[in-house]
């Protein structure tokens, strides 16, 4: 398994993985859970795919989504990529280093909400505390994700035990 995925074993439903601090280029979105479930984020994901494809970087960053559950009727979401290229019209977000518990969500895994539920249950059973001081969730999509196929992405929850920064 690669450094980005962490060390998963057959007796665990999730793996712990380190994410270094980095700067993302992308866009903020705000909306309801219902809007997101109905595909409201798809145009933003497609926009990030185009940004990634136009990047001169040798390594293609995953498309990273960060969630802030900051109101009862919905949430804020930042979707972006790590790139050295300047991108006019996009926002930059400095993301601190973090340790995350994560799992892959793919075809046959149920809904994303069900997968997050499995991940949260696994953390509780393992006695691992979440750290929502920067963001609530982190999602990583392949840079060439096909949104017409069953959704495949890495779901990550920041956990205690690493340094945190602040949103800028």
Predicted regions and their residues:
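A solvent-exposed interaction/effector surface
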Residues: 1-168
